[in-house]
Each structure stands twice: as C-alpha cells, then as structure tokens.
Regions:
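Serine-esterase "nucleophile elbow" of acetyl-processing enzymes
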Residues: 1-68, 214, 220
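Residue- and microsegment-level detector for short, conserved "hotspots"
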Residues: 71
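Alpha-helical cap/lid subdomain in secreted, periplasmic
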Residues: 74-248
Length: 248
C-alpha cells in the first residue's frame, strides 16, 4: 500500500481539472474538500503507485497545514488494516506557517495570505495571526513536529519518505540539523523541493497565476521518486505481486 499525504501538490490540484476541491464541481459537491478525482488520477502519488504496482490511498487536501497532515496520517495508520511492513508513506510538506484551528467541531486550515475565509468568531484572531507570523519560529516548529512524526513512524518500522513542496529547512542551524538518512529528500536546500525540481526541469505551472503543475509534471515527479526509491534500496526485488520493500 502506498499512502500519500500533503497539500494541493499531493492532491494534484488543477493537474487536469480546474477544480482543486471536489465540492467546487457542481456534480461532486457531496465530496466536500476531497481532491477532485480527475486530478487524483494523474497525481504523482497515483502514478507512482502504478509504477510500483501497489494499492493507493491519498489523504491530501489542498491548502492543508502540516498539523493536518500529521494528524490525518497518524489517524489513518492507527486505523488501517494494512500490515505496517507492507506500507510505504510519502508526504509532501506544506508551507511552514499554515495552521489548523478547531472551530465548533470543524477543522479549518489557515495560511498567512490574509485572504482565507474565516468564521466571524475568529476573524480578529486570524488578522493577528497574519500580522504576527514569525517565520523563524514557524520553521523550527514545523521541523520539530516533522521529527516527531518521523520518530513515531520509525518506532512502528514503517517505511516513509518526506519531501518539501515549497519551503525548505536551510534556516535550521547546523547544530540543530539531524541526519534523516533516506527518509527526507534534501530537506536543507533550495533546489531540493518539489517545485524547484519541476521548475529546473522545464515544467510550467498550469496558468501564469497558479502555484500548481500539470499532469506531465506529476508524472515526472513520480519517476523521480521511483528512481530515488530504487537507488536507496527501499524497493529491491520484484515478484509476481510487484515490487517488494526491503526491510531495514
């Protein structure tokens, strides 16, 4: 089983359908904030699952905070029937400043853009959040939270790979940096992010004012991840059921 989580870049937003959320499509309003299924079909996660011949589950949501990503990843793993040694988790991290707020029993995702749709009860709090974002503090907070998830997955002996979509951890001081082994793709460099890789390889955003890439770019990232997985010997052998994971 390949389980992926992240924000719009993992949800495949706009990859082939203009709607990021299923609910934006009049025919799919009942699906709420799930990714539009047309986009999931061509997303890097789905394409990678086809390459490694594994079943697939996408838990990503456009505009998701890393708090949401961590919460939903742990919830899914704690409830899955998939044996942990047959599971590969890949997460593309969101921007560091985003937050998740629980308001009237509903989770909301907020960034520092200042244009989020916020319930009246929390508009003042949101304005304060946008005005006072401390990027250094948010960067270190994200780093520590991701380390905790990594350690949790390690303790469960679950294979996992992390990568940065937009932001990176170059601002983390050398003394505070850990060696992630194969578990984190280039966490400390500008050119190690998802968008930097695609930009440097000539893939354009779907429109001039979009943050998102098309199906061709998602396929390219899937091929990059496959090469990474094979080179790091996360997958080592092939049998009748497909590629097998090397247990470390």
């Amino acid at each position: 089983m390949l389980y992926v989580n992240g924000d719009s870049h993992t949800a495949g937003a706009e990859a082939t359908n203009q709607h990021a959320f299923a609910e934006d499509d009049p025919n799919l309003e009942m699906l709420g904030r799930l990714p539009h299924p047309d986009n999931v079909k061509v997303s890097w996660g789905k394409k990678l699952s086809e390459l490694i011949k594994y079943s697939f589950f996408c838990d990503a949501e456009s505009a998701a905070s890393n708090t949401r990503i961590i919460r939903t990843t742990k919830d899914w793993i704690e409830n899955t029937k998939t044996p942990y040694d047959e599971l590969l988790v890949i997460i593309g991290w969101s921007t560091w400043e985003r937050e998740e707020w629980l308001i009237d029993s509903e989770y909301y995702q907020f960034g520092a853009s200042g244009i989020d749709d916020v319930p009246d009860s929390h508009k003042d709090k949101y304005k304060e959040f946008v005005s006072n974002v401390d990027w250094k503090q948010k960067t270190y907070e994200a780093y520590e939270n991701i380390k905790k998830l990594h350690n949790w997955l390690e303790n469960l002996k679950i294979k996992h790979i992390f990568f940065n979509c937009n932001n990176n951890f170059k601002k983390i001081k050398e003394k505070d940096r850990m060696n992630w082994g194969y578990n984190y793709i280039s966490p400390y460099t500008d050119n190690g992010t998802y968008d930097a890789y695609l930009d440097s390889n000539g893939y354009d955003k779907v429109t001039h004012n979009s943050w998102h890439y098309g199906a061709d770019a998602h396929a390219a990232w899937a091929r990059f991840l496959l090469k990474y997985i094979v080179e790091k010997k996360i997958i080592t052998t092939r049998n009748s059921s497909g590629l097998k994971f090397n247990r470390i």
